[in-house]
């Protein structure tokens, strides 16, 4: 199990829920590549409302179309490992927003096998 404490870097990739990579959801491809690269972890968060570079507001509110909602893929690991992963995103993320933020890991514990 990867041990991670102290200073870290948070990578957040904002894309649309309908964005794809070879007929697979883009957010899923990013998670699987992060896993294959051995990063500490990745999570996908679905937004309920938002807009991006297109300036089109997407929402889940009743009586509104809930198409292509915003999705954030968040990865936290050491700065070296996260920065090493960035070139893998270049071919995947052609539209969207990619941000990096320093953070501090207070606890990182996985489930213990039964």
From Swiss-Prot:
Gene3D superfamilies reported in the protein's UniProt record: 3.30.70.120
The record, for Pfam families, names: DUF190
InterPro entries in UniProt: N-reg_PII-like_a/b (IPR011322), N-reg_PII/ATP_PRibTrfase_C (IPR015867), UPF0166 (IPR003793)
Report the superkingdom from the record: Bacteria
UniProt lists the family membership as follows: Belongs to the UPF0166 family.
What name does this protein carry? UPF0166 protein SCO7045
